[in-house]
Amino acid sequence: MKKIKVGQIGKGSFGKKLLSKLDNIKNLSIEWVCGSQDKWWKQKKIDWVIIASPNEFHYEQAKYFLENNTNVFCEKPGTLCSKSLKELIELSKKNNLNFYIDDVLIYENITPTNNFVYKKWGGSSANIIDRMAYHHFYLIYNEVKDIDDINIKIIKNKTNNKIFELNFNNKHIYKFEYDFNWHKPKHHSISPQYNGDALEKMLTYVLHGQADFSLNLQRSLFATKISEYVKKHIYGKCAVVGAGIYGITAATKLKTKGFDVDLFEAEDDILKAASGINQYRIHRGYHYPRSLDTIKSCKDNEQSFIKYYNQSILDRNSKHYYSIATEDSLTTAEQYLTVLDKAGLEWKIVDTLPNCDLTIETKETFYNPTILKNICHNRIKG
């Protein structure tokens, strides 16, 4: 029998847990494992990809593999908004592929009917809501299904517990509690009641095509819609003005924190001002000779950019040139080189023009603006 070829994106705690379960599944071959910042899009062809990367990457990674004829298993949440999840579901149907979101369907028959507790020390509150979407909201699907008439009530508690109630059509009322100051092992109300290996069992069913993919996606979409609703009421709404690289990054980061974000741009598309026309390089600070703090900020942000938008990077050692004019410059050639040395920036003097006192050659990171724009569109939608 032909082995099922699997690749995985994600080497974090859940990624390691997934790999330990995959090792136990028969008729399966793990072809590659990438970190979320590695070149996952350049790996060999597989039958299934396992996505266990940070939440804001799920949409673009799932979309890439569904567009390239690969089945997808994705860690919850599938996406951060229901509209993008619905798009992925339609894409999987169009390409006749299996798409599955990590779930806890195995707990369905042993879950409390109206009171849910989730206690975990640390972490982010938005992430807790996304987890509740699949551990708790997910499991009330059979009773509720229709969320058109839904109301939320935030209950103030004397302790640090966070409590809210969801009321569906005045028929079903569910109480949810989570606590960030819980210093004991993490606990949610359904886990103590099942002693089997739910994760391994789920992976086996999914990768061998024996799971109910349609039901999984219906429940996942339902849970994501409730999660959107809850986060909107708990964390509120915010606006980001300007869809350059800073505005887009801020908007996507705020979205992962639970905010309902509107991104405004005066142009007809994103990245049409400085982010889209400025030589396609990631500045390291060579053009800020009068501010060491700004140079340091540029150097630090360069590494953040490379990690967050790694798929757009073309060349880490692209040659660029900077000159000091002979006339009207506020910085002399000597002062310029002194500042670069203090900042730890590399340079090499090269032949210069007659109207320049100095020209240096440097190496900076060069990115593909078309790929960057595509990544940004996906992050905004995801």
Model-assigned labels for residue ranges:
Residues 18, 36-91:
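Beta-loop-alpha module in the N-terminal Rossmann-like domain of NAD(P)-dependent dehydrogenases
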Residues 279-358:
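Dinucleotide-binding Rossmann-like beta1-alpha1 core, especially the glycine-rich loop
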